[in-house]
């Protein structure tokens, strides 16, 4: 599988909930190659291990990807310190992604918690043919 690596600028940052952050990153080459269900590896500044983070948005026209992650340790806390204009070291797209069924009349997408964001590109692909069922730990999420 072909993947790309580089330093890409953060265009948007949102705090979605306690310990839950969303970023939009400008990386046209990765966005052009990405498919629903794939992920990227992001290297937090000062760390040696990359963090795998699922894609929750792919905009091929704008050349952006969107990621959402939960703060779980020092690596994701370092990533969450990035602000608009900062660059992230991104490697991707990785993984095989979801199997797309272009002829499907109806699909049901089921996810829970931090497993919901990767379903967004899939729901966008199927549009009105998709029924989405999402579960969360609490109303805060």
Q: What do these predicted regions represent?
A:
Residues 2-84, 137:
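Ferredoxin-reductase
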């Amino acid at each position: 599988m072909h993947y790309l690596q580089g330093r890409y600028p953060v265009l948007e940052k949102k705090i979605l909930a306690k310990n839950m952050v969303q970023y939009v990153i400008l990386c046209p080459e990765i966005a052009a190659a990405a498919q629903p269900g794939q992920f990227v590896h992001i290297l937090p500044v000062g760390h040696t291990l990359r963090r795998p983070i699922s894609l929750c948005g792919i905009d091929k026209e704008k050349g952006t990807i969107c990621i959402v992650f939960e703060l779980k340790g020092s690596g994701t806390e370092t990533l969450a310190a990035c602000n608009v204009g900062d660059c992230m070291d991104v490697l991707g797209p990785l993984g095989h992604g979801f199997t797309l069924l272009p002829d499907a009349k109806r699909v049901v997408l089921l996810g829970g918690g931090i497993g919901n964001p990767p379903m967004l590109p899939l729901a966008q692909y199927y549009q009105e043919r998709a029924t989405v069922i999402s579960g969360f730990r609490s109303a805060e999420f």
